[in-house]
Swiss-Prot record:
UniProt: Mg(2+) binding residues: D99
Gene: mobA
Keyword Methyltransferase: no
Primary subcellular site in the record, as a coarse category: cytoplasm
Free-text comment on this protein's domains from its UniProt entry: The N-terminal domain determines nucleotide recognition and specific binding, while the C-terminal domain determines the specific binding to the target protein.
Lineage of the species this protein comes from: Bacteria, Pseudomonadati, Pseudomonadota, Gammaproteobacteria, Pasteurellales
Cofactor(s) the record lists: Mg(2+)
Protein name, per record: Molybdenum cofactor guanylyltransferase
Subunit structure: Monomer.
Presence of the UniProt keyword NADP in the record: no
Source domain of life: Bacteria
Function: Transfers a GMP moiety from GTP to Mo-molybdopterin (Mo-MPT) cofactor (Moco or molybdenum cofactor) to form Mo-molybdopterin guanine dinucleotide (Mo-MGD) cofactor.
Gene Ontology CC: cytoplasm
Binding positions (GTP): L10, A11, G12, K23, N51, D69, D99
Amino acid sequence: MTITISAVILAGGLGRRMGGVDKGLQFWRGKPLIETVYQRLHRQIERISINANRNREIYARFGVPVFSDRLAGFQGPLSGILTALERATTDYVLFVPCDCPNFPLNLLEKLKSAVEFSQISLAYAHDGERDHPTFCLVSTQLKNALADYLAGGERRMLYFMQMHGAVAVDFSTEKQGFININNLADLNSP
């Protein structure tokens, strides 16, 4: 089974734990988080877009397509995922959050292997202790099911994933790669 894949950086949140600032545009190690995440992701895949609900013109400076959630009101990462699946011209979409600059460089390789080997529609990262559902590879065939799920008022990512037979992919040897930047103090950490 050969599948086509594109990628989306999720940067559409409200940044509540950061006082409402746009997380992706906050500086970490001398450059915006989104730039670090983009560069790391670009080492794994060429076709990248950014999901952002604010400051789209700034995100567009990276020279990739930028789109907002179709659903209004900052409804969470599943809203950005839905819009990405609806826009995609590939079989699958790889998602990564904008606030995790050290994610594994083998993320796509391992998630892709899982969906191909198991012939499933969805795989996400697990670090040996915790699930990381925003690091996921999702089939575009799930867009209607996700639209129905969100229309029913649900927002729980893992629940949706489990409903659709998702596989948690082991990244226990890359656990440090899933530490995210949650607050302004984290921006100054090494």
